[in-house]
Regions:
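Pepsin/retropepsin-fold aspartyl endopeptidases
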Residues: 1-133
Length: 133
């Protein structure tokens, strides 16, 4: 099943959108990052910003990606309630099927995954268990 959460993205370009992102602890990043497809990057008008070229290790190969440092504020949502907010680097991957949060972003949002397969999670220190969207 996987665990997915709703995130409101507010770009430094002034554009906003809400997305559903997969929590992927196997996606490692030194800074809190969200990985998005080109279409969402275009919606946020990130192409107006200067991107760094970076390479992402994916299983048996490296993939060229665009990296926008501290380009969005991400706010974790649950049924419209704003839970936590984090400034995120944005990694844009052409052909990506669904957005994902990296390990350091999951930690920065204080998300504690209870069950990956059942899609259960909570905010660290809270007892309320939430379900994947």
């Amino acid at each position: 099943m996987g665990t997915r959460v709703r995130i409101k993205l507010e770009a430094i370009t002034g554009k906003n959108t809400e997305i559903v992102a997969l929590l992927n602890s196997g996606a490692e990043s030194p800074e809190p990052s969200i990985v998005i497809p080109t279409e969402i990057a275009e919606e946020l008008r990130l192409n107006e910003l200067k991107a760094e070229t970076a390479y992402s290790e994916e299983a048996t190969r490296y993939v060229k990606v665009k990296l926008y440092k501290k380009a969005v504020k991400g706010t974790l949502l649950d049924n419209g309630e704003e839970l936590t907010s984090v400034i995120l680097d944005v990694v844009v991957v052409e052909g990506l099927i669904e957005p994902l949060l990296t390990d350091s972003a999951i930690d920065a949002f204080n998300i504690e995954i209870i069950s990956f397969s059942k899609g259960l999670w909570r905010i660290r220190g809270e007892s309320k268990v939430r379900e994947s969207v």
